[in-house]
Swiss-Prot record:
This is Uncharacterized protein HI_1457. Keywords: Signal. GO terms for molecular function: porin activity. Residues 1-19 form the signal peptide. It comes from the Bacteria. The keyword Signal applies. GO terms for cellular component: cell outer membrane. InterPro entries: OM_autotransptr_brl_dom (IPR006315), OMP/PagP_b-brl (IPR011250), Porin_opacity (IPR003394). Coiled coil: none annotated. It comes from Haemophilus influenzae (strain ATCC 51907 / DSM 11121 / KW20 / Rd). Belongs to the opacity porin family.
Amino acid sequence: MKKLLIVTMLFTLALSAQAQWYVQGDLGASKIDITHVNSSNSPSFTQRISVGYAFDKNFRLAVDYTNYGKVTANYADVVDVSLKGKSLGLTGFYDFDLADFKPYVGVRVSTNGADVTANARYYRIEAFATETRIGIGALAGVQYKLTDNVALNTNIEYNRLASNVSDVGVKAGLRFSF
């Protein structure tokens, strides 16, 4: 029994020597598109904070919180709509280990929340709603290793936030490994 415990502990230490926890912060721009609604053409400022675990040199998982910012739109030139989007996601990554440059691809599943405000243009009517939907996304990017524990990150991503809401974004940030 003691030998099994010692072997298990050594195996755990060997795994943890290769694996790393990390925290990553990203800033960028997002273009949210709402089907059948004339949304503004200007991108919104997006922020993301992630906590992840690198299982080995190729596979990692991350949990993230993303703030998509505020988007304004109008429907049939009668109603002005304002949407503030937030998301909590789980992303699986595959890293292509090419020395200091590491291209990667990922798939993201998320729960997305939106605070929606609608105002009628010609009447004094205002409505508020909060909606939550499940979404899926894909991303690709590259990380450049600055030091053993710090990497510069850039990526492009597509997220289907709801059946009629999608997002295309570009982000850059820093990853700190422990």
